[in-house]
Design a protein with these regions (language model features):
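Thiol-based oxidoreductase modules, predominantly thioredoxin-like and allied folds used
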Residues: 41-53
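Short helix-loop-beta junction
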Residues: 35-39
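Short, charged, intrinsically disordered terminal tails
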Residues: 56, 77-79, 85-91
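Short Fe-S-cluster ligation motifs
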Residues: 51-64
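A short, hydrophobic beta-strand/beta-hairpin element that forms part of a small beta-sheet core
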Residues: 63-72
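Local sequence-structure signature of Cys/Sec-based thiol-disulfide redox active-site neighborhoods
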Residues: 2-34
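N-terminal, polar/charged subdomain of small-to-medium soluble alpha/beta proteins
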Residues: 50-54, 72-77
């Protein structure tokens, strides 16, 4: 495992699907931004209120939902170590 130096996840993207005013979303985004800054991954935030109806139906009760390179990674909370490991894992 890497020693924490940046660059491990360059080119990877973590997307958070959430809502404005959601305290769990705010907490999750703090973790996502910290891990992505450390590893060199990109952060993308999408607003569930502006998402297509199908996506709102699928994820409404799970926000925040996190995706790594488009694949669902987690929902409700973001575990820092688990996200870090997912970003370091080669696909």
């Amino acid at each position: 495992m890497a020693d924490g130096a940046g660059g491990d996840a360059a080119g990877r993207t973590v997307t958070m699907l959430g809502r404005s005013g959601c305290h769990l979303c705010e907490e999750a985004l703090e973790v996502i931004e910290r891990v992505c800054a450390e590893l060199g991954a990109r952060v993308e935030v999408r607003d569930l209120d502006a998402a297509p109806a199908k996506e709102r139906d699928d994820y409404w009760d799970k926000i925040p939902v996190t995706f790594v390179d488009g694949a669902q990674h987690d929902f409700w909370r973001v575990d820092e170590d688990r996200l870090r490991a997912a970003l370091r894992r080669a696909d």
